[in-house]
Structure formats: C-alpha cells, structure tokens
Amino acid sequence: MASLEVSRSPLSSRRELEVRSTRQDKYSVLLPTYNERENLPLIVWLLVKSFSESGINYEIIIIDDGSPDGTKDVAEQLEKIYGSDRILLRPREKKLGLGTAYIHGMKHATGNYIIIMDADLSHHPKFVPEFIRKQKEGNFDIVSGTRYKGNGGVYGWDLKRKIIRLYRKEVLEKLIEKCVSKGYVFQMEMIVRARQLNYTIGEVPISFVDRVYGESKLGGNEIVSFLRGLLTLFATT
Amino acid sequence: MTKLAQWLWGLAILGSTWAALTTGALGLELPLSCQEVLWPLPAYLLVSAGCYALGTVGYRVATFHDCEDAARELQSQIQEARADLARRGLRF
C-alpha cells in the first residue's frame, strides 16, 4: 500500500500523518444516533472528507436506537455509497442509552483507536485529524476537545454538554467498565476515572457551532442537571 | 476515599483547630491581634472564595471566543455535502 501520490494534498501535514501513523492504525468513529435523519449524511460526508484528505484508515459505526424519523434508512443509503467496510450499521431496537450504545459499538469496532462524537454537527469532523496528530505527539491515552483554550470557542449559546474525544480502544474499554453513572454525567465520570487510573489526557481546541442559532436554548434545566451531575461525581468518586 | 469525604475531613480538622484556638480550649494565650484575625477568618475565606468564583466565571464568559468563521464555513460545507451526496444517489 505504498503511497506515492504527492499531488493530492498540498499540506505537508498529510504526509507527516502518514509517516507517523503506522500501517496498522485504524480509527473507529462511534456515532450513536436518535432522530438524526438530516444530520447523519452531513456528518458522514465531512468525516469521510477529513479522513480521506489525511490518508487515515477509518470506519464509522452508526448505532441507531430505532429512530422513528427514518435515520436507519439514510444510514443504509450511506452504507451503499461508501461501502460496508467504511460504514458499519449496528442498530438497536429502541432507545437504550448512550453508555450501552458505546459498548455495543465497540464490540464491532476493528480499529485500535475509538472516536466518540455526536451526530448532530455540534463538532466539525475537520478536528478529528488534529486529535489524531495530538495523540501521536504526546502519546496520549485520551484526547479531548475543549472550547475554552487556544482558539476554541462557540457560535451560539447551547449549554448542552457536547463531548468529542479520542481514546485508545483498551483505555475506553477499561473506563466504561469502571463507570457507574448514566446519561451524559458518565462522560464526565470517564475523565475522573481516567485521572484516577493515571491515563494521560491531551486537549485540542475546537469550535462548537450551533446550527440553529437564533432559537433560544438557554435553559435553567441544563444548568441544574449539570450541577447535579457534578455533585454526584463529587460524592461518589 | 471520595472527594466529598476528603473535603469533609479537611474541613473537620481545620474547623476543630479554629474552634480550639478561638475558645481557648488549648489554654494557649494568643496575642490579641492574632485572635482578632482568627475569629472572622472562616467567614472571610468563604466570601473570598465566592468572589474568586464569580470573578473567574465572569472573566471566562467575557473572553469566550466567538466563532463566526466556523459557522460560515459549516454552512457552505453543508451545501457542498448535500450536492455531492445527491449526485451519489442519496435521497434526503
């Protein structure tokens, strides 16, 4: 699989990434979906574009929890377009929760790195190669996106906790095993456990774009949930 | 030990030290200036912590980056994606 094409991308980063990642590195993106019929094709297209432009070996695992809006149909069309070696459909009958979605997805993942992100375009897949680069740079076990450092930021005020992270597969398996909370609190708990287990964590500044900016999303509910989650973690870890 | 337990322990130790010193239970004769500072210390520390927290949050909110470029870029890429996918046979 010698890569002698030099004209595909003017960026030296592409060759840099190819040289540094070994032939065996493969990145599995886990995309749990629920009613993402409109967003799913877009995020898959952007992911494919980012990975192809950087010459990264990847697969995208779509875990749909019986979405009533036909997300699964769209996923099947994407599988036909991009191939079943790149788009893996592993749906479930009904909404069974995020944690179990990740476990289910990981069982079918053939990559040695797992990327977890939301399917609703809250994070742009263009950052994924940066995550990969950062991970190689510091040999990190986990790389997390942050809106608060560097040139990270937001467009639109959505307080929902959106998380995008890259994990070594065995690290994610270990952490999921140890975590006990439910919902998005468990994503927070994963970082707490990771620190307890002395895993190394890197950060990449990312931008979050709220596509439906203009609709008010500031809800006290979200703040309350976050504080409750924080207190729960404080008292249990 | 959970973080909560650690904090409770720490507060218990500091609290009992402060109480012992301010009530003279240890029989120590502290100079008056020390006693004057020691007595309101917990309240003072609490208020300072609150001010620091509010100040930090305020500063961070004020300096939060606004990504207009990212929003524009995303919108144009969405157009591109829809066109390309439609060409490849995706029925939206």
From Swiss-Prot, chain B:
It is a multi-pass membrane protein. One of its GO terms (cellular component) is dolichol-phosphate-mannose synthase complex. Pathway: Protein modification; protein glycosylation. Its main location: endoplasmic reticulum. It is found in: Endoplasmic reticulum membrane. Stabilizer subunit of the dolichol-phosphate mannose (DPM) synthase complex; tethers catalytic subunit DPM1 to the endoplasmic reticulum. Component of the dolichol-phosphate mannose (DPM) synthase complex composed of DPM1, DPM2 and DPM3; within the complex, associates with DPM1 via its C-terminal domain and with DPM2 via its N-terminal portion. This interaction stabilizes DPM1 protein. Belongs to the DPM3 family. This is Dolichol-phosphate mannosyltransferase subunit 3. The gene is DPM3.
